[in-house]
Amino acid sequence: MKRMIALDGAQGEGGGQILRSALSLSMITGLPFTITGIRAGRAKPGLLRQHLTAVKAAAEICRATVEGAELGSQRLLFRPGTVRGGDYRFAIGSAGSCTLVLQTVLPALWFADGPSRVEVSGGTDNPSAPPADFIRRVLEPLLAKIGIHQQTTLLRHGFYPAGGGVVATEVSPVTSFNTLQLGERGNIVRLRGEVLLAGVPRHVAEREIATLAASFSLHEQNIHNLPRDQGPGNTVSLEVESENITERFFVVGEKRVSAEVVAAQLVKEVKRYLASPAAVGEYLADQLVLPMALAGAGEFTVAHPSCHLLTNIAVVERFLPVRFGLVEADGVTRVSIE
């Protein structure tokens, strides 16, 4: 009988990432786990719709036995079965993040018995989660270098709090893993500013682009008007293409927050990234830990290890026979498999 892993959901950043990573790793390794204190560090602890959808999606994909899978639950037991490829569809039923549900189940499908397609409906532009364009333009090219081939398509936008978006990913089983080396980002090649609008006046986008252009020499400026029924919503993004990596930063517009303030938040975030020689931004770092651990080798540099990153590493080390090393030098932290 396989050993049961016991996790404390209050450890580290105390959010949903502990649960999502545990589900992914449990499906991959076949190790069951229990988790208590789910999202104990959040104002509204326990399973929200997005987390419950991730649990049910994971259970369906690997025929798991689950206890505690209900809204508000702070305890879960998950006994995985065999991962099977297929065509899967999951609905969150709110503006909860589609990409975070995908992030939970796709790693298991890298080891499935055949290709798969996963479609999730819910929120696509959520201030607390990476948008589909981040997955498509930043994460997936890096996964391809590791030997992981998946392709994400945004079928319909769904802004917070209304939702109604749809994201789909096609994924193939991995045949072999490669080592990812991201020590330096290299020189900047292009800066792209982009604004999405749905049911919001165009002058909002023009003011956001102007705020970005006042701080950066943009090589591209794009405004995309979406159908009104996909809104109301607004997201402003800035993509930094360097020689060795493309990073993408975004801010979701909010009611009663001016276009200038929204764009200024993005400017601050991008400047913080560019002020360090590190290759990887804070949010991308979280998402490289699992694929790098599965490959058994690799490294990247990040300006500062976030609590999210450290928590994710701790969970990965509970399930896999790997150890991460973090070394600070020359203004960056080098994260590697020891």
Swiss-Prot record:
Subcellular location as annotated: Cytoplasm
SUPFAM superfamilies in UniProt: EPT/RTPC-like, RNA 3'-terminal phosphate cyclase, RPTC, insert domain
InterPro entries cross-referenced by the UniProt entry: RNA3'-term_phos_cycl_insert, RNA3'_phos_cyclase_dom, RNA3'_phos_cyclase_dom_sf, RNA3'_term_phos_cyc, RNA3'_term_phos_cyc_type_1, RNA3'_term_phos_cycl-like_CS, RNA3'P_cycl/enolpyr_Trfase_a/b, RPTC_insert
UniProt-listed Enzyme Commission number(s): 6.5.1.4
GO MF, any single term: ATP binding
Entry keywords, A to Z: ATP-binding, Cytoplasm, Ligase, Nucleotide-binding
Cross-referenced PROSITE patterns: RTC (PS01287)
A biological process from GO: RNA processing
Enzyme type, top EC level: ligase
Record-linked NCBIfam families: PRK04204.1-2, PRK04204.1-3, RNA_3prim_cycl
Function: Catalyzes the conversion of 3'-phosphate to a 2',3'-cyclic phosphodiester at the end of RNA. The mechanism of action of the enzyme occurs in 3 steps: (A) adenylation of the enzyme by ATP; (B) transfer of adenylate to an RNA-N3'P to produce RNA-N3'PP5'A; (C) and attack of the adjacent 2'-hydroxyl on the 3'-phosphorus in the diester linkage to produce the cyclic end product. The biological role of this enzyme is unknown but it is likely to function in some aspects of cellular RNA processing.
Protein name as annotated: RNA 3'-terminal phosphate cyclase
Organism the protein comes from: Escherichia coli O7:K1 (strain IAI39 / ExPEC)
